[in-house]
Amino acid sequence: PVDGLSSTENNAAMIHDYVSGLPSEEADRRLILLGYSKGVPDILTALVNYPSLAKRVDAVVSVAGAVGGSPLTEDATQAKANMLTVIPGSKCEEEHGDNDAVNSLRPDVRQAWLAQNTLPSNVRYYSAVTFPEPDRVSWALKNSYLVLGETDIRNDTQLVIFDQMIPGSRIFAVVNADHWAIAVPVSRSHSIVGGTLVNRNDYPREAFVEALLRYVEEDISEDH
């Protein structure tokens, strides 16, 4: 329920409003929040900004989360980010937000936020890191993989692996998939693009999500 092209502050408010708008019969329901890429700092910001939301959350699960930002944003513009709306399967759409996603993902911004804010201690945090072998990187992402590799070769084409980890979280998976393959099913709906530009997009996403939710559920239940 967030705008992929807006700031973490904007999207944190959207998350809060969505949860607040759930039917009254679900008011006591405990929540597990699952985020991908920029969705993770959106969730973390929501927990800090809205304590009433944090009280309802049992766990936050990060998949290739942009927790510490991305060095690629240092030379990026919001206009380039807006081009994500044309990527098949990305689900990035132009919304009526603040159009400030890129600034929210700059490493200095994210690191400053992490230094200035304490994550709620009642919530369990889990991180799944994407770290593909070179032959598992799609052609369209090769350049960003190499550019980011000048900072750290241990990256998923968009994020360095250490920037994907929520502080104090349990690292429960290191996945051999690039940043798109883990969550954006380009090849399923666009076979030509999937066979050429995004040619390493085959990943069993549904099975992965089922496994991670089962893991988190069992981990939580053991402590209750």
Predicted regions and their residues:
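Serine-dependent carboxylesterase/thioesterase catalytic core
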Residues: 13-115
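Short, well-structured alpha-helical interface segments that form or flank functional binding sites
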Residues: 10, 29, 120
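Helix N-terminus capping/helix-initiation residues
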Residues: 7, 42, 103-106, 160, ...
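Extracytoplasmic low-complexity repetitive segments enriched in small/polar residues
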Residues: 6, 31-33, 223-224
